[in-house]
Curated annotation (Swiss-Prot):
Spans annotated as Nonhelical region (NC4): 1218-1459
Listed Gly residues bias regions: 1537-1546
The name this protein goes by in its record: Collagen alpha-1(XIV) chain
Domain Laminin G-like, first and last residues per copy: 1230-1425
Alphabetized UniProt keyword annotations: Cell adhesion, Collagen, Disulfide bond, Extracellular matrix, Glycoprotein, Hydroxylation, Repeat, Secreted, Signal
Gene name tied to this protein: Col14a1
PTM field: Lysines at the third position of the tripeptide repeating unit (G-X-Y) are hydroxylated in all cases and bind carbohydrates.
Organism annotation: Mus musculus
Amino acid sequence: MMIWQCKMRDWLILAFLAAACFCTIVRGQVAPPTRLRYNVISHDSIQISWKAPRGKFGGYKLLVAPASGGKTNQMNLQNTATKAIIQGLLPEQNYTVQLIAYYKDKESKPAQGQFRIKDLEKRKDPTKPKVKVVDKGNGSKPTSPEEVKFFCETPAIADIVILVDGSWSIGRFNFRLVRNFLENLVTAFNVGSEKTRIGLAQYSGDPRIEWHLNAFNTKDEVIDAVRSLPYKGGNTLTGLALNFIFENSFKPEAGSRSGVSKIGILITDGKSQDDIIPPSRNLRESGVELFAIGVKNADLSELQEIASEPDSTHVYNVAEFDLMHTVVESLTRTVCSRVEEQDKEIKASALATIGPPTELITSEVTARSFMVNWTQSPGKVEKYRVVYYPTRGGKPEEVVVDGSVSSTVLKNLMSSTEYQIAVFAVSAHTASEGLRGAETTLALPMASDLELYDVTENSMRVRWDAVPGATGYLILYAPLTEGLAGDEKEMKIGETHTDIELSGLFPNTEYTVTVYAMFGEEASDPATGQETTLPLTPPRNLRISNVGSNSARLTWDPASGKISGYRIVYTSADGTEINEVEVDPITTFPLKGLTPLTEYSIAIFSIYEEGQSLPLVGEFTTEEVPAQQYLEIDEVKTDSFRVTWHPLSAEEGQHKLMWIPVYGGKTQEVDLKEEQDSYVIEGLDPGTEYEVSLLAVLDDGSESEVVTAVGTTLDDFWTEAPTAIEPTSPVTSVLQTGIRNLVVDDETATSLRVSWDISDSNVEQFRVTYLKAQGDPMEEVVGTVMVPGVQNSLLLKALLPDTEYKVTVTPVYTVGEGVSVSAPGKTLPSSGPQNLRVSEEWYNRVRITWDPPSGPVKGYRIVYKPVSVPGQTLETFVGADINTIVMTNLLSGMDYNVKIFASQASGFSDALTGLVQTLFLGVTDLQANQVEMTSLCARWQIHRHATAYRIVLESLQDTQAQESTVGGGVNRHCFYGLQPDSEYKISVYTKLQELEGPSVSIMQKTQSLPTEPPTFPPTIPPAKEVCKAAKADLVFMVDGSWSIGDDNFNKIINFLYSTVGALDKIGADGTQVAMVQFTDDPRTEFKLDSYKTKETLLDAIRHISYKGGNTKTGKAIKHVRDTLFTSDSGTRRGIPKVIVVITDGRSQDDVNKISREMQADGFNIFAIGVADADYSELVQIGSKPSSRHVFFVDDFDAFKKIEDELITFVCETASATCPMVHKDGVDLAGFKMMEMFGLVEKDFSAVEGVSMEPGTFNLFPCYQIHKDALVSQPTKYLHPEGLPSDYTMSFLFRILPDTPQEPFALWEILNKNSEPLVGIILDNGGKTLTYFNYDYTGDFQTVTFEGPDIRKMFYGSFHKLHVVVSKTLAKVVVDCKEVGQKAINASANITSDGVEVLGRMVRSRGPNGNSAPFQLQMFDIVCSTSWASKDRCCELPGLRDEESCPDLPRSCSCSETNEVALGPAGPPGGPGLRGPKGQQGEQGPKGPEGPRGETGPAGPQGPPGPQGPSGLSIQGMPGMPGDKGDKGDAGLPGPQGVPGGVGSPGRDGSPGQRGFPGKDGSSGPPGPPGPIGIPGAPGVPGITGSMGPQGALGPPGVPGAKGERGERGDLQSQAMVRAVARQVCEQLIQSHMARYTAILNQIPSQSSSIRTIQGPPGEPGRPGSPGTPGEQGPPGTPGFPGNAGVPGTPGERGLTGVKGEKGNPGIGTQGPRGPPGPAGPSGESRPGSPGPPGSPGPRGPPGHLGVPGPQGPSGQPGYCDPSSCSAYGVGVSHPDQPEFTPVQDEQEAMDLWSAGI
């Protein structure tokens, strides 16, 4: 019954209940469930079912408890549930069950019952029962599995990660069975967040996490996730998936717990397509116990490799998916048992306490690190945890090391900081107490030996010694001048730079420069220096003209540089006049208003934007103003007289006339016109003597000298004679004095004040006279001054300093003079400048400073002159406010006397004198060495500031001189071509920018001539300029055949002598030279490392003797390659290899092949032909272009004509940063990096961590760089001269599935500290490409490229990458398509003291870091930025253009008819000169007495066609026999014919080239045919298997197991699909793909896709790029028929046949034809990769008739891989491409083929 709880106010619901319910329903109750039933389904599980109650209810509460008492477990169920499974029960125990329905807060009466599980094995303590809910009807949850047999009741918990194979081979139906299996698996465990956790990952081509361990909290949630697990689809890359869960699932962030058992369960149905051993080993070693469950096609041996031991309990394998349920109970029991055992082990180890380590010791303390050592703890320690933090506070850091380690280095610390340290011993579940201590780091090291040099007007350089460990440097620099002190600048640079330029400085300014070494964000103590910039350039060549009495004209030459004008300062010599004017940028200027007869000093300054220059100085004296030569007084009267003079010229000005009574009075004056010559002075006093003065006043205000005359007016009593004499009274004479208290005081150096008291008011005037007291008493008066009678003081001026004067004052009355009064006075001594100081000494300047005098000054005059050498006395003037000056243009290392005068009102003061000295700009320790008869060398100690040296060699016999200039860093120079026994003077001048110091000289005499003259001229040819930087391994090959003769051979030797003499440095640091003389057999005259000096080398050349014989040039070239260019003979890595061949005739052996090989290997060959030499042969021998490498002279006397050009070309080749290499048929400048890293067939086996694999087309070799191979080479071997400024890096590479997601450097150059300098970084996780380097300023720069074209490089296919670097940009070209370019600065060159590395992980540190695995097929550096635009990507199948690309090696073409296409007929072979190149054929028979003929045309019977993959023969029509023709190009594959008749016998071939090594395939007899495998995505051709024993042709086998479904490939056009199918794959589809029909017919017409025969699917990419090799499947149906070849066992992609014997073409007659080889066994259904050439088999099918030619030997079988005929393309994955479904039978495929698909 249902009881409903209703609210009283809810009348609508009450009404509904009243109408719908039985009358027995009681309001407020919920009806209980009924019909409770029990069903035991396993030994610990029971199913409970019931009938739902009537009415409305919200859900159920199910309570289960042991009847004997114990914990009651309650579960809430949904209202749709009608069943529940209770798990984890114990047998032989009664349980009570209560089931209650509830609605909101009301519950029904419980439906109750009891049950007991009998006859089951005894169990452990009861645990919480688990309930499995089963919905009724159409509930949202599916029903549970019918049977649950086991439940893990252990209290131990675990972290279980299940890894599920979701590849295409499983199928959607089978994947449902996998879900059921997973549900049973999860059900068996007690799952919860605090119990056992279960995570799951699904994988195919790429793994993904479906849910982490901590994703769900209950078992129900986990089961729900299992039921909704999506099917992924893809490839089977189990190794990648195992590594994925190792890196992502068993981590704390993913829910993994410490101290908890870790279980990994793998479920897969096939063999992995990648390596599973390393990732499974990593998981096991990390403590994960692995279980492997294989289904259907799983590889048991692989499962055993993955799982933990023992295999009997950890490996499960079932035949079909519907049998997986049979292993659930066994698996869960084993896992449960192992979890319990591990839990005990974990707890036991946790109980064992660990004592702390002891004896903490710190050592090796630096500023950023120190080492911590301790004594190990007793007991089993898994690891040590070292915790450290700054004492003053900071975040604790820690380092964890292995338990076997007892020390570690703490890095990246702060300098000068105390750190607290604690070391803990850690076991699996416990840790010890900490061992504690402290240590203080040192201060950061600072820069040392700071030096400022190369100083200019606005720049200087600063350098210092590098600081170990510094991450960079901070440079601060600022002027010391007071007004500029705030203009401080800073510069940050990288740690590799210790020499930089500071620019933008002020001229003539002292700067302080401070350098800090930076360690991250920390800075060291500063290193500081001071230096003064040079002054600006002054004007030149001052000329002074038109000097007059008051004017002059200045003219000068302009200053260099951009100026804004000039400042002119002119000063009188006495310092009383200082004038200044600024003018525009003119070169002449008039000076006016000068004082006549005055000496002037001139200073002209250039005015720049930065300031003004030093002055250009000069001096001159103005002329005297003409004085008046005549002045006369007449017409004298009592009150007037006339003054007469000669008038001035009109242009000089006017006259000034002045007069004054001689005995005192007022001076009067009058200005008169210049033409006036007399004037009457009136108003004079009678009987008075007057002084009259006349001077000329010039127009500019200056005055001439004064002309003076004295005249006396008549007394008035003389006007007329008295008529009578009147008597007079007697007169008494009285001496009068009107002066008292005469005082002389207020003394200065040039003045005295005289004062007195007036005692008589009748005094008319006072006469003051003064004279020197020390002089003769009769000495004339120095001066007389008349003052009025009312004045009682006077200031006497212009006196001499420090002089005693006698001053006399006399009163003057009307009637005469009174009594004079005298007093002494003395002037003070003059005060001049004091305390001369010298600073800023430099090579051509010095600064002087002085203290000014106490008194006022007008300026200063500085006079200086060299002491020890005759020279002009120099002087300059400065203003009164200046007390320092820089004396410039001085001589280096010279003493100067300096005098400084102060200009004062009275003249110049006494001189302040001193001695100053400039620095010496000159070398030291100059000495001669290596003195020979005709040469000598000088060496010296380098001057620290020198920018260059000028070396002069003077002969004392004939005064001839040689002069050279070398750089400032050079300390040695040699002179050649000197006279023996002659005295020479060697002078070295040191230069600093434009400044040159004095010479330092020594005398040296060359050695005397030997007693007997040498056979050859003794003069060693001087090195040519073009050869100064030459560095090469140079071999001369000299023809010594009979046709040369003794005389001509000596001419060759003389030519070699001159040529070698042009080289500069001989030996390991320069050019090494070897010599070979060749005839029938080559003879090595000396090896590359035989001589270390030019003298000994030339002497050896002189003594080469003539050999005689025949001309075997080819043999000699091979001898040079194999014998001389070896490490034993001194050849060096990374150095250009140059050969010079000299011959006079045609070679009697083949030169073409060996020459081509050596050119392709990077040798630079010069060929010189004389007389009868064959020019076409010379062209074959010489490198390209022939215009630079091939020379021809008419006779042996004409070598001089080519000598200079040959030397130039050879030295340019030897000096080039980029050597010439042979690439794609042309010679160009660059580096063949594959050879330099040893990644070539002959060398790769010696490189650790590298294997050779098939590359593109399955024909080119590529090299797999395995994980942590860290392939490297020293930079000095690869790029000894660094990288050019512009270059292109070309790579052909492939990213592998196990290439890590972290960034790694595809290639990079490291310095000696393992710091990257330049390189390319690929980020597999971020799908980006980054190029980095240091620019010319020392700054680190990076540019990153991304986008679709970049991302596709990471999808697992081969891609061609060009990175173009120029001075302005970096450009990236992918698969011959430009994808982007970015601006960069010009690159700095690299250091050669580091290494170059392939694949280095970016996070790696130090020389032993990690590297990423990838495949590399090609790597070149071309010294050009245009190479990328010329490349046609011929190595990539999808981009290859057959018309423009060269033929593939050992390849077959794909044509529409599959028939051999004949090329055009070549000319018939025979004796004669070599003709034009014909079709690639065998050499014709040897002609009589002549050189080898050219290859002939193809014969009617073609050679055996290229070898196809091994398979069952499909008989064709018999071929007709014919004569053997020359070897032609490999023809297109035709249908297999029946064996033809026996052809003419041919020669045995030489051994063929070995094929690529591959994985071992399981060999065995061919099995019966099975169903064809499902087509896979286009992938890399598989690796060639090892050669197996010859097997007989087996019968068709029974159908084999179905292969895995491949990834979807890229879309191709319908036209391409049909064309490729018709042309190539007709017979393949007819014989092997008969089962493809029904599904393929469902493919839309416009989105068809080509799939190759089953191969390992690659990452989404363009279809043509190869994927990783697939494992060998079971034997399949007959493969595509190939021509009869040598038998081989079926292996990966077609095993190679027995190695054939193919040799170099001989010149003898053709040998007999070899017997046909045995037939090959049938192969598997997949096309094989090309194997090595087999020996000649039976005659192949008939080809097209060719032009009859001579019988040729059997051709070398080639390879024809049908997969290479598939439509390769470049592309990315297409998510919208329709999914392929496996073809079920052959009829479907036949139907599809007939439909034209």
